[in-house]
Amino acid sequence: MSDVIALAKDLIRRPSVTPQDEGCQTLMSERLARLGFVIEPMVFEDTTNLWARRGSEGPLFCFAGHTDVVPAGPLEKWHTPPFEPTIQDGVLYGRGAADMKGSLAAMVVAVERFVAEHPDHKGSIAFLITSDEEGPFINGTVRVIDTLEARNEKIRWCIVGEPSSTHVVGDVVKNGRRGSITGDLLVRGVQGHVAYPHLADNPIHKAAPALTELAATVWDEGNAYFPPTSFQIANIQAGTGASNVIPGELQVQFNFRFSTQLTDMDIRERVQALLDKHGLDYELTWTLSGQPFLTDTGALLEATVAAVAAVNGQQPALLTTGGTSDGRFIAPTGAEVIELGPVNATIHKVNECVKAEDLDLLAEMYQGVLERLLA
């Protein structure tokens, strides 16, 4: 069993469902401390974070990731217990195998090997690890970044270990992510009896044309790196449950995944103008989960593409698809940020798994990036 697989299994054994860490960061810290890393736990409320750094000079290279996992779901649907890592036919099963304890293991072992070969490497290496990525993302990476910014500790390059790959490890590198903003809309009407509609005001009927227009709007055309901005209605609630009552209000929740062609303020203003045009009596609150970011050039992207190609024999595709990641908190500081991790086909599913060999290859890729930037 390789060092990478052994560490991955040790991490998976710990049932660290958000926001719990269950000792994962301590396990990582012990190994990093032996390499000369200064270990700095950062605990905010219910969230455990780790900032570990080797070296004091720039440029600063950072591995970022999370030790928390989503709940296992129905245990009877798992082939093997989710927190008892098992290898069958070369495949490692367990909650977090792909998202993202496998990446964490590959990162640590890659750094161990790199430091053994280059004890006096250039710059500094750091780990930014949180137990709050799968949850509300309030006390995790964003709080660590705030702390680093307050003391002017700047990350130059960052690899986030999210499972970026589609079919083969390293076939996709995420060099950016779309922004995400959610709107919670309350449309007011007047409740009444369905047989006396003239005495009521149906908020569903009033809002339907506006919602139809929102769904039909072309918000932008995207660009070379991002698909067009998308609008999706996620939840609609109204009524008492009775078939003879016109509801007094309608609640609608919708989400935008937006490209760099728009700002969140553009979206807010356009939505409000549309709702006003339809004469609705409404309240609208917004939750911005993250701005879009893009690393389209730079030393990190060049080193990552070269390192992946050296292992796989072909260059990765550069994509910005998928959901948000903690990269959205790191990129605004000016850092170059990319995501590279295992195949994501089973993340958040029962029987989450990853080819064991892929984690060894991932460690080679991570080490290859370090070689090209800091050796």
Swiss-Prot record:
Q: Where does Zn(2+) 1 bind?
A: H66, D99, E162
Required cofactor names: Zn(2+); Co(2+)
- List the InterPro entries: ArgE/DapE_CS, Bact_exopeptidase_dim_dom, DapE_proteobac, Peptidase_M20, Peptidase_M20_dimer, Peptidase_M20A
Tagged with keyword Amino-acid biosynthesis: yes
Superkingdom field: Bacteria
Could you tell me which CDD domains the record lists for this protein?
Answer: M20_DapE_proteobac
Q: Which reaction does it catalyse?
A: N-succinyl-(2S,6S)-2,6-diaminopimelate + H2O = (2S,6S)-2,6-diaminopimelate + succinate
Positions binding Zn(2+) 2 in this chain are: D99, E134, H348
Cofactor descriptive note = Binds 2 Zn(2+) or Co(2+) ions per subunit.
Q: Is the Amino-acid biosynthesis keyword given for this protein?
A: yes
Pathway listed: Amino-acid biosynthesis; L-lysine biosynthesis via DAP pathway; LL-2,6-diaminopimelate from (S)-tetrahydrodipicolinate (succinylase route): step 3/3
Q: Which GO terms describe its molecular function?
A: acetylornithine deacetylase activity; cobalt ion binding; succinyl-diaminopimelate desuccinylase activity; zinc ion binding
Keywords associated with the record: Amino-acid biosynthesis, Cobalt, Diaminopimelate biosynthesis, Hydrolase, Lysine biosynthesis, Metal-binding, Zinc
Q: Which residues form the active site?
A: D68, E133
| Cystines in this chain | none
The EC number on file is 3.5.1.18
GO BP annotations, alphabetical order = diaminopimelate biosynthetic process; L-arginine biosynthetic process; lysine biosynthetic process via diaminopimelate
**Quaternary structure annotation from Swiss-Prot or TrEMBL:** Homodimer.
Functional description taken from the UniProt entry: Catalyzes the hydrolysis of N-succinyl-L,L-diaminopimelic acid (SDAP), forming succinate and LL-2,6-diaminopimelate (DAP), an intermediate involved in the bacterial biosynthesis of lysine and meso-diaminopimelic acid, an essential component of bacterial cell walls.
Q: Which family does it belong to?
A: Belongs to the peptidase M20A family. DapE subfamily.
Record-given protein name: Succinyl-diaminopimelate desuccinylase
Q: What is the lineage of its organism?
A: Bacteria, Pseudomonadati, Pseudomonadota, Gammaproteobacteria, Aeromonadales
Q: Which gene encodes it?
A: dapE
